[in-house]
């Protein structure tokens, strides 16, 4: 009887979702400050950020000071939650830094990032390494294992859902951007044979309705993946066009948005840069949005969060 019922449900629905339902963030609700105008270990625009939810650490990635735009050289800063720089390390020839992920392993934090940057400055694979203050990793000489989760994986980046323990990657095949999700424990062990989800990202403007086709970061919590889009005031002619949206991680369908976010609207320059999920000690789950501010030669980090779930 149970088998017959399963067969009937499968026939009616077509596909059984591998990612169960969960609460999601209401993107229309206000954003709150964690900080504004904080320095990192680099003076360039922050590209993204991530949290180690177990060891309570925060990391921000920038292009390395003095490196060319297409060099793939990055600086990862560790900051405390008041914005004080605690340490940093450099990555040479690795990528653009669109997204990084932090995986706690005991008392250590391992960073997932791009590596082996092409002439474009974007990475062609992923790798994972322990954050160590003061250390420099050079992709040209470092022999640690490269991670290529799927065929034709290019310009790939990663984010981790720290609550539901999943690794989500965004990557390019040809000219198409894609999302894939994996069980974190399996992915960390090198097993990418059974993606929980895998789909092409709809065109940000033509299909999802964003104001501009400028992708600035993503984060995942439960059944949903969140995108941040938009330009700096310098690029937009002073117009605020930053938006957030929620998509079903199982299907790729738009669930909410695009919603204009006015977080940090008075900041100078104000370029959207990065998203991440953090769960506080008290259990509150937060969707963080990052923005760069300041002037060339003195860029600053700004982090805001939404915390209302529906």
Regions found by a protein language model. Name each.
Residues 29-41, 84-90, 142-149, 196-208, ...:
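A short beta-strand motif characteristic of beta-propeller blades
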Residues 36-72, 226:
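Beta-strand-rich domains and repeat architectures in extracellular enzymes and scaffolds
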Residues 64-69, 116-121, 173-177, 232-236, ...:
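Short glycine/acidic-enriched loop and turn motifs that connect beta-strands
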Residues 72-82, 122-134, 178-188, 239-253, ...:
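Beta-propeller blade signature
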Residues 74-115:
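Blade-loop segments of beta-propeller domains
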Residues 253-280:
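Conserved blade-ending motifs and adjacent loop-strand segments that build the rim/top face
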């Amino acid at each position: 009887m149970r088998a017959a019922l399963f067969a009937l449900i499968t026939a009616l629905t077509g596909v059984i979702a591998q990612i169960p339902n969960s609460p999601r963030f209401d993107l229309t609700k206000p954003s709150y400050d964690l900080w504004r105008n904080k320095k990192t270990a680099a003076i360039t625009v922050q590209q993204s950020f991530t949290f180690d939810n177990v060891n309570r650490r925060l990391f921000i990635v920038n292009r390395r000071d003095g490196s060319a735009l297409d060099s793939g050289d990055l600086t990862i800063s560790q900051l405390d939650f008041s914005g004080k720089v605690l340490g940093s390390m450099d990555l040479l020839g690795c990528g653009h830094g669109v997204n990084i992920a932090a995986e706690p392993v005991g008392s250590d934090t391992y960073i997932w990032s791009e590596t082996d940057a092409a002439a474009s400055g974007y990475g062609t694979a992923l790798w994972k390494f322990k954050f160590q203050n003061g250390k420099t990793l050079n992709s040209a000489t470092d022999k640690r294992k490269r991670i290529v989760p799927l065929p034709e994986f290019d310009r790939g980046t990663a984010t981790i859902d720290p609550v539901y323990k999943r690794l989500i990657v965004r990557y390019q095949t040809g000219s198409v951007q894609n999302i894939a999700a994996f069980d974190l424990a399996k992915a960390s062990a090198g097993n990418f044979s059974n993606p929980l989800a895998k789909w092409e990202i709809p065109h940000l403007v033509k299909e999802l309705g964003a104001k501009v086709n400028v992708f600035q970061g993503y984060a995942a919590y439960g059944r949903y993946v969140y995108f941040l889009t938009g330009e700096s005031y310098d690029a937009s002619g002073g117009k605020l066009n930053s938006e957030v949206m929620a998509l079903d991680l199982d299907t790729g369908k738009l669930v909410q948005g695009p919603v204009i976010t006015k977080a940090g609207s008075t900041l100078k320059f104000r370029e959207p840069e990065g998203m991440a999920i953090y769960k506080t000690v008290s259990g509150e789950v937060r969707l963080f949005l990052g923005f760069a501010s300041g002037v060339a030669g003195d860029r600053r980090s700004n982090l805001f969060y939404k915390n209302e779930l529906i």
